[in-house]
């Protein structure tokens, strides 16, 4: 059973899956790839279609730095969930990694890579 702290969270924006989840994912990416200095983020499905209104792009820019991130809106859903994101992580011009993550509600995340869970 979930604790009350898991059930009731205060976040930015009107939708936890569109702000808390992407914010948490961006923090995890930043923490995991400390040498990165540029990011491309692809918001898929529902995140792409309603992300601007729900401030998804703004919360990611806030975490990764507006000058360091390019955000792309892709209407097609990824296979596992309507709220999919792909983070491409760079150091200078070298691609360090590409991470697929899903914001599944309430700030919870599902990564394609089990090492990031």
Task: Name every feature range the model reports, one short phrase each.
Residues 38-74, 82:
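A structural-propensity feature for long, helix-poor, extended segments
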Residues 19-23, 54, 81:
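Electropositive phosphate-/nucleotide-binding environments in soluble metabolic enzymes
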Residues 13, 47, 105-107:
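A generic structural motif
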Residues 63, 69-117:
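C-terminal regulatory domains involved in ligand/effector binding and gene-expression control
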Residues 24-34:
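Small-residue-enriched alpha-helical segments and adjacent helix-cap loops
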């Amino acid at each position: 059973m979930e604790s009350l702290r898991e059930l009731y969270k205060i976040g930015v924006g009107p939708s936890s899956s569109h702000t808390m989840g992407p914010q948490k994912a961006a923090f995890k990416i930043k923490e995991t790839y400390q040498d990165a200095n540029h990011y491309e983020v692809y918001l898929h499905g529902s995140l792409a279609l309603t992300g601007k209104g729900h401030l998804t792009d703004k919360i990611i820019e806030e975490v990764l730095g507006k000058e360091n991130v390019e955000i792309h809106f892709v209407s097609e859903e990824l296979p596992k969930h309507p709220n999919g994101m792909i983070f491409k992580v760079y150091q200078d011009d070298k691609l360090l990694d590409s991470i697929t993550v899903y914001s599944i509600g309430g700030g919870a995340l599902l990564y394609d890579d089990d090492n990031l869970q």
